[in-house]
Amino acid sequence: MKKMPLFSKSHKNPAEIVKILKDNLAILEKQDKKTDKASEEVSKSLQAMKEILCGTNDKEPPTEAVAQLAQELYSSGLLVTLIADLQLIDFEGKKDVTQIFNNILRRQIGTRCPTVEYISSHPHILFMLLKGYEAPQIALRCGIMLRECIRHEPLAKIILFSNQFRDFFKYVELSTFDIASDAFATFKDLLTRHKVLVADFLEQNYDTIFEDYEKLLQSENYVTKRQSLKLLGELILDRHNFTIMTKYISKPENLKLMMNLLRDKSPNIQFEAFHVFKVFVASPHKTQPIVEILLKNQPKLIEFLSSFQKERTDDEQFADEKNYLIKQIRDLKKAAP
């Protein structure tokens, strides 16, 4: 029986699709009169590529064609070009690129993830995506692809241990709310998804990271301030981060900052600050400077906590924690001379 060809005359094979896409992206890059036709060809090629990777309603993706397309994307450098030229592609095309990128990233052969291996050896792809936060028309698309990359520990590690990681502290403060929120979602993902990796990263880079982090906790932007406080609470209460927590709660300047945030004008900020403050007070191994601050403010703190957010009548855990902290502060004694 004669074997049917994988691609009919009307359907281009992966190598042809990749070549047409590359050629037309090159035309778009020149920004000359031929761009309309090129833009149309780019859209068609992206659709064809998506069809191979995702299949159609009645057909599963053809394994052989998917493998060919993946190989072409790597060998031609098109995966890099698609990110580099994302701003030149129309709205629907940007969505297609995101879908193609995330689909090819999830592809596995046994236990191997070929695209993860490819990006690991071409890490500038990650930094191009990260820099996308600086371009409003592609920022959210880059965020989606970046978070898909972060699901894979080797790629998360490259970003965490890079100089570019610190750019997040700038991006989460951007004036465009959608972009700043998306950047924070990616930032949070990086710091919470791979627990052992993150603990190692924070231990190695404690001073630098927490110096930057403190600025977020004092941000003029309410959302940034609240999200950062909430994330800090999650980080120091995670058992993997015990060393980081111990270091953080040993420093008097951190306790002073939380005591100030307990008096913030926003009840939500106060509440998030409470969840960090309680770790200082509840710790059985307080450093002497911490004990001294708590003793110096002992009567004020007891009075303050007694009436702190009394309106939270339905939150039993909060009431129990508050009573526990009041008892801990009341029982503090000056060290014997």
Swiss-Prot record:
Transmembrane segments: none
Gene designation per UniProt: Cab39l
Role of this protein: Component of a complex that binds and activates STK11/LKB1. In the complex, required to stabilize the interaction between CAB39/MO25 (CAB39/MO25alpha or CAB39L/MO25beta) and STK11/LKB1.
InterPro entries the record matches: ARM-like, ARM-type_fold, Mo25
Name under which the protein is recorded: Calcium-binding protein 39-like
SUPFAM superfamilies: ARM repeat (SSF48371)
Family, as annotated: Belongs to the Mo25 family.
Top-rank taxon, per record: Eukaryota
PANTHER family: CALCIUM-BINDING PROTEIN 39-LIKE, CALCIUM-BINDING PROTEIN 39-RELATED
SUBUNIT field: Component of a trimeric complex composed of STK11/LKB1, STRAD (STRADA or STRADB) and CAB39/MO25 (CAB39/MO25alpha or CAB39L/MO25beta): the complex tethers STK11/LKB1 in the cytoplasm and stimulates its catalytic activity.
